[in-house]
Amino acid sequence: SAPWDVTVSYGAGTALAPDALIEASTQLDLYDASAPGAWLGGIATADIDYSLQEESRKLRADAERVIEHLEEGGAPDDERIERRLRRINEGCAAMNDNIYRQARQWLSQGKVVGLVGGDHSTPYGLIRAVAEKEGSLGILHIDAHCDLREAYEGFEFSHASIMFNVLRDLPQVSKLVQVGVRDYCDAEAERAASDGRIAMFDSRSLARAGFAGTTWAESCRRIVDELPEVVYISFDIDGLTIEHCPHTGTPVPGGITFEQVVYLMECVADSGRRIAGFDLVEVVPCPEDKIDAVVGARVLYKLCGLALRTSSA
């Protein structure tokens, strides 16, 4: 897990998700029709590294000063801001290396590795490790956002930059299939339209297709057809409709439902493709309302089960 939320640009708190998801997981029944008996293959959680959480807390204070400075119209080349940005970027790079080393260790033992964030910057090291191991793969990216911004707010490893960084740095990633996106800038729209590696199934287009009579099964076939044989799933909880994640850091109206996304992931597994790794990010737990963690735990269990099912097929 990566209890880390340094670069969040709106609401914080996703660094607390790993603990909350473990707690919520105790309310799960083991039978899963998507992958019956998959849990018998073994699902384990590595110990949470609370030193990461503490480093995140310290760097988050720097990030808040940077964001406030920029929002107030301050110059990005202010010397104090540059010092803070340097600390943040160095800290995020170290976090990525930490995750990368852990992932390589587990992958070398033949494990299927998933990561629980944390914000959406956290899976970079895992994606890198899985990409290097597999040689070639595609990413199924479920999200309200494209995450194709370059160094958003000056943060080289921003949660809004994860897919920009992946496409720039990892030639093994042959395809990025984005589903549910509905909040993005002109530059991201232009990038998605011009880069042949990107297939975007935005929330508006999916909804309009449904209104015009296209079934969700037909839409899922189109989505899955874009994916290569080896798939990594990057699941930002805010890709779901807002009742499933009311406290996530950057909530956006619209999206896809829990049942729709489960069907989509089942279609990936049913197609014979192999899920080689995954992440679940941007879950923000709330002490007064457990729904974010409850939904997150169930998404995570589905990801684990389907990954195990496809790895043993």
Task: Show where each model-derived region lies.
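Conserved alpha-helical scaffold segments that buttress catalytic/binding sites
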Residues: 1-313
